[in-house]
């Protein structure tokens, strides 16, 4: 392929890729497999870069410095411009704790190491993944990392061994990723460079296959097969599948088949002006669509956007994508000396670093520091939450009577509650909990996030040591998360029956009222002049009713709902003080107030 050749159908393929990603991110129910558009980009990139390197190698004018200069000019300027703007907005809109997480993601993004950062990111109390403005930079990190590998593969492998070597490497890495996906490290595999290398190599192999004369009918059938593989991936692959691994083969093969083909009706359709235009803007559209979505979702604390917000998102994405392409991306891609390019890049990088520093200061200046007691339900180093600390005792340490509190983070928020109640009624409480996990025997651990499973299993085993000897047991949980699992409801019934056989009393606490939006974000937005009101989440009350019905079937169990007490009359405030640390958890102040109303 000539290095000067421009194929409009490839721009059309890019448009399909970016539109599928945007639609999926806007609402994953509209296009369940739309996320594979990223994999299409990887295949296209492998195809084009392989063609460029091999052509220049054949012409004896390949230069590593020129190659990396062109890649940097293509990717970095618009990338840094996006980071600068998003950082300033995050400084204004994000509460300080969330901005700290964002700042860490910026640092990783600047090193093009976002994939590693997000593979390890599981801050239970941080923003949800769909609220992280730079989450999408993981794919750009992988692309830049691949560019460090590909030249070596192509330049130092003998030409006759190149295709077999790449084919064997593709097969080996696909097998490795498929194997790893069936372990408990699926998130790391998803963001792994090694798991994504085969996708680039599908494109590389497509570039290596010599062109042969085939009939028009065969040509068209190949293109149709490619289009069907892509369409099938969009339709039938979902987030629930293990991915990438073998599930990535259909979309990668389909994209490769269309790249190898250029004369079919499908390729001519992809060459139509609307597809070419969107494909030309695809990089900038990809850069901007996700931060806009994440910002809207952060403010609204909801995944699904109402119609007006969706229209706003589409308009802003198109506008900022065009502005980025017209005034940032294009100027840097024009021919200029390497020194001039690097001077501009150094300038933008300097502005980025200064912006991050200024934004960090701005984030804290816009609102005074929030006391720790309002932002957490306890000091992590003092809680037996997801790990054991000492004897886990709260309340009256000298008391003879010991009650065992078990559950997920809604049990962890009861540590100060236990202090208040325990000291008042001369009782010891042992509190054992784990994130997303009600620590009772046979809890369906595989249902929760991968990062929490090992801690969940460990805490269940720890809780077993104290269950039989406890004078009574208190269960607490975020019931709206657990009542969707019939397996959990079955195990809850069994736990209550086993306690009854031991003649052991069990008190099941109702889930505390849940807000639709994080109150700290509401406070921040209102401080910025953005009017936001408090509303309640619709599911917590119905979940309580389901748990209450189960408890009612066991004579040894009691369901206690304190949501009607004065402490919850004006959530998230009580006596003029914030009592929630986020939309569903009480903070230290709230836990103590909750304990006061629970004292007999």
Regions found by a protein language model. Give the residues of each.
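Membrane-interface helix/loop caps of multi-pass membrane proteins
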Residues: 1-338, 578
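Extracellular/periplasmic envelope-modification machinery, especially enzymes
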Residues: 239, 300-311, 315-600
